[in-house]
Amino acid sequence: MNFELTEEMKMLKDMAYRFAVSEIKPVSQECDEHEKYLPEIRKKAAQNGLVGAWIPEQYGGSGAGILGNTIITEEISKIDMGISLNVVASGFGCESILNYGTEEQKKAYLPGICSGEKVCAGAYTEPNAGTDVAGYKTRAVKDGKDYIINGNKMFITNGTVCDFMVAQCITNPEEKKHNSFSLIIVPADAKGITRNKIHGKMGIRASDTAEIAFEDVRVPQTNLVGKEGQGFRQL
């Protein structure tokens, strides 16, 4: 079996590294030292097809797949891990939208990621549970045609710079844990959301990391990703 990269992937690898050297290296030290997030780098990367590369072309991506996205991540990270995350993780959380969302959700959220104009956050980790998905406590309770969300998320990548987030919430508390969670799209500017940037990280400081609090945050039930009660598996 031939494991060598195709010529197209080799070109992608070279282009990603050259982009990192020309656009990221000059500001790397400053961004790391001062915890600075530069959206213009993300937008320039998007113009070169480096953002949301794993997303199919029909939704605005370059269609490079997981392998192509991995190559981009490796090459940019050689220069700076933090700024690399700003580029390749700007769609973090959208994997669930692509895999389980409705066609309307895909068309509404994915193109903006690929163009570099929008940023998503995966609002999963919680203070009490870390990345133990079964231990999350954030609740989403139905009220009419909406969900009302209450809870806290911690160490959320893109937390203060995102335009929307995909949040893991308990929607079916009466079910066993693996059947109790759902993924819900939440606009970052929704009333009741508080976002606080986490300062003083030991590394990857150019990447935005935040604590997010939900207090009676109301979103329509149409923002449910996939099926209710399937969030544990989808994540």
Q: Residue spans of the language-model regions?
A:
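A glycine-rich, basic-preceded beta-loop-alpha segment at the flavin cofactor/substrate interface
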Residues: 67-68, 188-199, 208-235
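Amphipathic, small/basic residue-rich leader segments at the start of a protein or domain
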Residues: 1-85, 108, 112-115, 119
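Short Ser/Thr-interspersed hydrophobic loop/turn segments at strand-loop and sheet-helix junctions
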Residues: 49, 72-77, 168-169, 186-191, ...
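A short core secondary-structure module
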Residues: 146, 150-195
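N-terminal glycine-rich flavin-associated loop
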Residues: 81-104, 130-133
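A short, Trp-centered hydrophobic/proline-enriched beta-strand micro-motif
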Residues: 116-125, 168
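Short Gly/Pro-enriched turn/cap motifs at secondary-structure boundaries
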Residues: 86-88, 128-131, 155-158, 174-175, ...
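A structural signal for short hydrophobic beta-strand segments in well-ordered beta-sheet cores
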Residues: 138-141
